Amino acid sequence: MADEQNLDAQAQDQAAEAGAGDELTTRVQVLEEQLAAAQDQSLRVAADLQNVRRRAEQDVEKAHKFALEKFAGDLLPIIDSLERGLDLSSPDDESIRPMREGIELTLKMFQDTLKRYQLEAIDPHGQPFSADQHQAMAMQESADVEPNTVLKVFQKGYQLNGRLLRPAMVVVSKAPSPATPSINEQA
């Protein structure tokens, strides 16, 4: 009888241990799932933080790159005036030669300074017309060049760091229209 009681006690102990083992296994599984979820969330937060940091760096870079845009745009009429003054003055007139040389030097210094800040002129004379960089002011028939070629530049365009600041104002070629026969030729 004592053996039976021992066997019953052992069976009960084994059943209790098995129940406790199942409970512990379930508990470990739940904790592992929670740990995996926490690690996943941690990785997502780190990735989001990295994306925010990268966007902020790009915004600062763009701000630095294009901070001069308004200022450079305000300087363009001054460059145009200096160039127009040189175009309208005669290089052979001795009475204005010192003034002309001063304007040329000033313009060169101005252009060199603007180049250092990535402001570049667009002078498309003889190039194919591009609506992205040019503004057609007129069309002119020409048999000498391909249609859609820039014949004349009224005003240079400018770009800052590759971004268009002002389009070049141009005259664009078009194919000559066929000659209409005169009344005498028709008869």
Swiss-Prot record:
GO terms for molecular function: adenyl-nucleotide exchange factor activity; protein homodimerization activity; protein-folding chaperone binding; unfolded protein binding. SUPFAM superfamilies: Coiled-coil domain of nucleotide exchange factor GrpE, Head domain of nucleotide exchange factor GrpE. GO terms for biological process: protein folding. GO terms for cellular component: cytosol. Keywords: Chaperone, Cytoplasm, Stress response. NCBIfam families: PRK14139.1, PRK14140.1, PRK14150.1, PRK14151.1. Participates actively in the response to hyperosmotic and heat shock by preventing the aggregation of stress-denatured proteins, in association with DnaK and GrpE. It is the nucleotide exchange factor for DnaK and may function as a thermosensor. Unfolded proteins bind initially to DnaJ; upon interaction with the DnaJ-bound protein, DnaK hydrolyzes its bound ATP, resulting in the formation of a stable complex. GrpE releases ADP from DnaK; ATP binding to DnaK triggers the release of the substrate protein, thus completing the reaction cycle. This is Protein GrpE. It comes from Pseudomonas syringae pv. syringae (strain B728a). The lineage of its organism: Bacteria, Pseudomonadati, Pseudomonadota, Gammaproteobacteria, Pseudomonadales. The gene is grpE.
